C-alpha cells in the first residue's frame, strides 16, 4: 500500500479548495465565508467584502479558503489580469465561465508554492494597513490646511 508523504498531503489539502462562484442575487442567503467580485467595468475581478449589483459571489467552505481566494483575486485584480477576459464595447464585463476557469488555473499555480504565497499575502496585508493609515493621515493634513486658511477668511453670516 502506498502512503503519501506529509508534504504531498499538505499540498493536496491546499489544492482541494473548490469554492462556488455564482452571479450575486439579493434573494440568495449569505454565509460567513463568502465575498463578492465585481464583474462589470474596468475594475472587473476586484474582490469586495460587501455585495453590490453587477458582481459575482464566491462561496467558500471555511475562513482559510475565503482568505486564499480573496487575496488571490486581489492580486490578479491589482495586476490587471482580468483585463484580458473583458468582453463588450460600451461596458466591459467578464463571463462567469471564463472567470471560473482562469481562477482555477491560477489557484492551482499558487497552491504549488503555498508557503511563499502565504508569506506574500501576509506582507500585502501589512502594506494594505499602512496604505489605509497613510490615506487617513493625508485626509487629516488636508483638513488642517483648510482650517489654517479658514482662520484668515472673513465669513459672511
Residue ranges and their predicted role:
Residues 1-107:
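DNA target-recognition domains and sequence-specific DNA-contacting regions of bacterial/archaeal
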Residues 153:
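Hydrophobic/aromatic-lined pockets within catalytic cores
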Residues 69, 100-150:
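Amphipathic alpha-helical segments
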Amino acid at each position: 500500500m502506498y502512503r503519501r508523504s506529509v508534504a504531498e498531503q499538505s499540498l493536496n489539502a491546499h489544492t482541494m479548495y473548490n469554492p462556488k462562484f455564482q452571479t450575486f442575487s439579493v434573494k440568495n442567503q449569505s454565509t460567513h465565508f463568502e465575498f463578492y467580485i465585481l464583474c462589470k467595468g474596468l475594475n472587473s475581478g476586484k474582490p469586495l467584502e460587501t455585495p453590490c449589483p453587477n458582481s459575482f459571489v464566491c462561496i467558500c467552505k471555511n475562513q482559510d479558503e475565503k482568505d486564499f481566494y480573496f487575496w488571490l483575486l486581489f492580486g490578479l485584480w491589482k495586476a490587471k489580469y482580468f483585463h484580458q477576459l473583458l468582453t463588450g464595447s460600451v461596458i466591459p464585463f467578464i463571463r462567469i465561465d471564463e472567470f471560473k476557469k482562469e481562477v482555477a488555473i491560477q489557484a492551482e499555480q499558487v497552491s504549488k508554492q503555498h508557503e511563499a504565497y502565504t508569506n506574500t499575502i501576509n506582507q500585502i496585508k501589512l502594506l494594505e494597513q499602512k496604505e489605509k493609515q497613510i490615506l487617513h493621515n493625508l485626509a487629516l493634513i488636508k483638513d488642517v490646511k483648510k482650517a489654517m486658511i479658514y482662520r484668515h477668511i472673513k465669513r459672511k453670516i
